[in-house]
C-alpha cells in the first residue's frame, strides 16, 4: 500500500454583483428600475472516476478556484452562474482539512459526486429596492464571497505491477522511462530509498500503476539491506516483474533463482503471483543472445506465452530491454497490460 498525496487550497466562486439600471425605451422616458441579480458563484465538487489512478494532476498546485458569478444585467436579466470546479479523483481518495487534519470526505465509489464548497450568492439588482418612497433606487448589492479551504488529498494506492530486482539493476531508470515517476537515478546501490509509484500510460484509454522498491539483496528476507522494509509494499500487487541484469557478472540463472528465493522466503503467496521477466541493460551486455538462449533453455521458459494457455508457474514473457536506448519498452508495456487484463 502506498500513499499518494497533494495539498492545495480550493475556493468556490464569488457571487456576481447586482445591476443598477433603469428601463429606457421609446415612449417610456421614465421607466423604473430593471437591474437584474448577479449570478451565483461556481461550486466546488469532488467526482470519483475509476479511470483516474493517481493524484498527479494536483501535484504542484497551490490554489484552485471555481469561477465567479456574472454581474446582473438590465431588463431584469440574472447573470450567469459561475462555472463549477470539478475535482476528478480516483476511488479511495480521502479529503482532509490541511489545518486541522479533520477527515472531510471519503471518496470510494465510481461516479460519486460530492458538493464540497458552495459558491457565493449573487447580489440583488436595484429592482428589489424600489419602494413607494424611492421609485428610482440606485442601490444594488455586491455578490457574497465564496468559501476557501486548505485541503490535503490522500490516496492509498495498490500498484498493479511491482518491480523486483537487485540494487542498480535499472528499476528506477525503467520506471522513469515508461511512467510519470521521476525517481533519483545514480550508479550506486540503494538509490531508491522509498517506494516510488508511476502511472504507465499504454494508450489513450489504458494504463497501470507500477511500483519501484529498493533493491533486494541476498538475505533481504532475513532483514539485510533495505529490501525487507519494502517487500511488504508489493505484497498486494497483481503482477511481479523480475528484473535481471544482462551485463552483470552473475549468470541470469543465479540472479533469478536468488530473487525468487528471497521472495519465497518472505511470502510464499507473493512467490505464486503472476510474473514476467525483463532482462535489463541490453545496451551494455556482451553476448546477449547467447545468454538469453541459455537462460530460456535452462528453465524451459518461452519468450512469450499465450494468455489463454498461461502456465502461471512460468513467466508470461521473458523480454530483453534497454531503458536507456528504449529497446523493448513498448512490448514490455503491452505485455504487462495483457497479463493485467487477463487477471480481470
Curated annotation (Swiss-Prot):
BP GO annotations: ribosome biogenesis
Chain intervals with Polar residues compositional bias: 1-12
Quaternary structure note: Monomer.
Chain ranges of the Obg domain: 1-158
UniProt-annotated stretches for the region Disordered: 1-36
Alphabetical UniProt keywords: Cytoplasm, GTP-binding, Hydrolase, Magnesium, Metal-binding, Nucleotide-binding
CC cofactor: Mg(2+)
Gene for this chain: obg
EC number: 3.6.5.-
Described purpose of this protein according to its UniProt entry: An essential GTPase which binds GTP, GDP and possibly (p)ppGpp with moderate affinity, with high nucleotide exchange rates and a fairly low GTP hydrolysis rate. Plays a role in control of the cell cycle, stress response, ribosome biogenesis and in those bacteria that undergo differentiation, in morphogenesis control.
InterPro entries: G_OBG (IPR031167), GTP-bd (IPR006073), GTP-bd_Obg/CgtA (IPR014100), GTP1-OBG_CS (IPR006074), GTP1_OBG_dom (IPR006169), GTP1_OBG_dom_sf (IPR036726), OBG_GTPase (IPR045086), P-loop_NTPase (IPR027417)
Family, as annotated: Belongs to the TRAFAC class OBG-HflX-like GTPase superfamily. OBG GTPase family.
Protein name per its UniProtKB record: GTPase Obg
Residue intervals of the OBG-type G domain: 159-341
